[in-house]
Amino acid sequence: MAFANLRKVLISDSLDPCCREILQDGGLQVVEKQNLSKEELIAELQDCEGLIVRSATKVTSDVINAAKKLQVVGRAGTGVDNVDLEAATRKGILVMNTPNGNSLSAAELTCGMILCLARQIPQATASMKDGKWERKKFMGTELNGKVLGILGLGRIGREVATRMQSFGMKTIGYDPIIAPEVSASFGVQQLPLEEIWPLCDFITVHTPLLPSTTGLLNDSTFALCKKGVRVVNCARGGIVDEGALLRALQSGQCAGAALDVFTEEPPRDRALVDHEKVISCPHLGASTREAQSRCGEEIAIQFVDMVKGRSLAGVVNAQALTSAFSPHTKPWIGLAEALGALMQAWAGSPKGTIQVVTQGTSLKNSGTCLSPAVIVGLLKEASHRADVNLVNAKLLEKEAGLHVTTSHNPAAPEEQGGAECFLTVALAGAPYQAVGLVQGTAPMLHALNGAVFRPEVPLRRGLPLLLFRAQPSNPTMLPTMIGLLAEARVQLLSYQTSVVSDGETWHVMAISSLLPSLEPWKQHVTEAFQFHF
């Protein structure tokens, strides 16, 4: 999937000037317009392939479906709550964020919240401003020796851990993705959640808001916590059940909470914000000059690198696409799409299970990025959808009646020659199997149903191929075929045959354009099909 035709980018929220400068230096046109209504945003996007936002702009399904040229949405920040990911994915629009841009700012705010909870600094400040001097009321607690539970050990979680360890806190945590030995390297002992709750004096959450993390702290988990636990949420509103938190504060099970985020922002229900044991901020996690500059810089660099074909970073809705920018993987992506298009033409818009098999050590982990490319080849012509691409391929797979499986064989079979790696695409339970390989950077067709081409057949994007199977002993067959091409005013560009398999030979003709019909060919051959990708 190429983004070389991305020319113009709209920046619809306030960003550091460096964002615009980097985009322009990378050869992109930039339009900056803020505070746009939905209708104004749609109007501006009619001439833009890219959109960069912070959190103010709402990229809804209406906006996405109306923006005919839009290819990429970049979120200068971590959360993508303001982008309709499902609508973007279905439309084949790539969504990117800058997961590291505001990590330090969010981590520092979290640490500040922990300190404020321990010493009741905001409450004491408010008391002083009221003209009071209440030393006894604001008795605090030391952090030294206390246990901090960190739920989510990504970049922010680990930055919080290393900083709070400087205060003498013992850090424990949980993350289903980070390996225990990795978290141990930055001083966090991983434990199951049920073991974490009763050990913690402080708990801070740093996970995305997912179905599995919504209400992670709830009535049941608060009941398992140490009495007097203090809770910090600078991640996403909803990870801490706000009703359960209020009940825990009222009962004394929770001694205090620091909240930078809420389920509804700004919160209409003020019960938590107004509670004397709650410290709150209006979602300030990324609100530092440094974070804003860093996020603007990072998203601009990501756009330029993507357009130049250098790399793809921060992908939210098509992680497998990241591998497509690897110099090793790029030609295999092209091969996978070509074999998918070949299979679609050969098997006649197949349904059922498509088997994608990688062979050879260097393709060991490539199945997840090659299978979407196979789907693109299968669906683009059959569905007549120009927007079928690596972003939405997996989403459209099931709707098309397909089930694509991937598997890997470490070594390529000896009978397939000296090549180290092969890609096989087959229709399960039917006689359709195509094998390809890459020579240098060129995708090549190696075999059809075991009939090997020597040399292999080049698969060039945009070049139509006519393939047919026939008896090898008919001397009049080739002149007849050339005559049929001439009648259709189609030029023969090249011609290759396979070795004999099951008494027949596969023939491949590169032609100047697709034939209007294959009916005249059917009386001369066993089967025939044509395709391009």
Swiss-Prot record:
Pathway: Amino-acid biosynthesis; L-serine biosynthesis; L-serine from 3-phospho-D-glycerate: step 1/3. It holds the Pfam family 2-Hacid_dh. GO terms for molecular function: L-malate dehydrogenase (NAD+) activity; NAD binding; phosphoglycerate dehydrogenase activity. The modification N6-acetyllysine is found at K58. This is D-3-phosphoglycerate dehydrogenase. It comes from Sus scrofa (Pig). The modification Phosphoserine is found at S14. PROSITE patterns: D_2_HYDROXYACID_DH_1 (PS00065), D_2_HYDROXYACID_DH_2 (PS00670), D_2_HYDROXYACID_DH_3 (PS00671). Catalyzes the reversible oxidation of 3-phospho-D-glycerate to 3-phosphonooxypyruvate, the first step of the phosphorylated L-serine biosynthesis pathway. Also catalyzes the reversible oxidation of 2-hydroxyglutarate to 2-oxoglutarate and the reversible oxidation of (S)-malate to oxaloacetate. Belongs to the D-isomer specific 2-hydroxyacid dehydrogenase family.
